[in-house]
């Protein structure tokens, strides 16, 4: 079995080994094209193969499709080919142990694929066993009021946003977004990532990770649509009620404010 090489080198070498070897260093591209035409082979446009097209294949400027490749291998006496990584190929010669090595390589590849499939099945089964009954995505009424009261800052302990824990790590909801904002004092000033990373779910390996960008944007739009939050885009400076600057922001920051009656509105639905 030969080393891994480009398909053009295999074709050119095989052509030069037989009747298509030219008088000089090249192959007889015109004769090869004529034989392909005799066999009824055409290019991707349905046109007759030209010697220029054959030259492109042998020099590696283009590659033939699989039907044409099969005809070329039959013409050049190429016994078998095996595709490898990186666009390389292996040519099998009948006189060496190539066929056996080829079968062994294919068997090894199939065994790896079977092992991966079995591992995926094990992981899926483990994940199914770890699933917990999901609470309703939208918490309402007394439940929201109870959780919000637990998460709100108090005199004994100043509640930080990072201390809020998702009670149902497999789910996320508009209610969770509101509870995170409540734990942060009712508002958030910054870019999306700063708030998004505080809403976490469990991945397939049991690790906490922030929800996806798409999920975060959906929560924001749902909360806005239900009148739970207000969003001011492109906030560069945070100001108090009298218009005095009390903080600085960066370009792209937004001010997300939890509206006073969010518990009632969330509970209604």
UniProtKB/Swiss-Prot annotation:
GO molecular function list: DNA binding
GO cellular component assignments: cytosol
Top-rank lineage group of the source organism: Bacteria
InterPro entries: Cro/C1-type_HTH, Lambda_DNA-bd_dom_sf
CDD domains with a match to the protein in the record: HTH_XRE
Protein name: Uncharacterized protein YffS
Species this chain originates from: Escherichia coli (strain K12)
GN (gene name): yffS
């Amino acid at each position: 079995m030969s080393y891994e090489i480009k398909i053009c080198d295999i074709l050119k070498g095989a052509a030069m080994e037989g009747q298509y070897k030219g008088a000089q260093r090249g192959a007889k591209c015109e004769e090869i094209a004529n034989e392909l035409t005799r066999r009824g082979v055409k290019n991707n446009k349905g046109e007759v193969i030209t010697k220029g097209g054959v030259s492109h294949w042998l020099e590696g400027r283009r590659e033939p499709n699989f039907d044409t490749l099969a005809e070329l291998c039959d013409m050049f006496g190429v016994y078998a080919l095996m595709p490898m990584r990186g666009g390389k190929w292996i040519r099998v010669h009948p006189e060496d142990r190539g066929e056996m090595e080829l079968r062994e390589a294919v068997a090894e590849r199939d065994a790896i694929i079977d092992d991966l499939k079995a591992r995926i099945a094990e992981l899926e089964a483990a994940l199914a066993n770890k699933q917990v009954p999901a609470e309703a995505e939208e918490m309402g009424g007394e439940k929201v009021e109870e959780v919000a009261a637990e998460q709100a800052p108090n005199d004994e302990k100043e509640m930080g946003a990072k201390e809020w824990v998702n009670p149902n790590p497999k789910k996320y909801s508009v209610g969770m977004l509101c509870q995170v904002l409540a734990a942060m004092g009712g508002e958030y000033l910054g870019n999306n990532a700063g708030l998004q990373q505080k809403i976490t779910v469990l991945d397939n390996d049991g690790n906490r990770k922030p929800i996806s960008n798409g999920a975060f944007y959906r929560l924001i739009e749902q909360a806005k649509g239900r009148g739970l939050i207000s969003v001011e885009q492109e906030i560069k400076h945070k100001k108090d009620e009298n218009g005095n600057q009390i903080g600085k922001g960066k370009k792209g920051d937004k001010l997300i404010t939890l509206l006073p009656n969010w518990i009632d509105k969330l509970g209604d639905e």
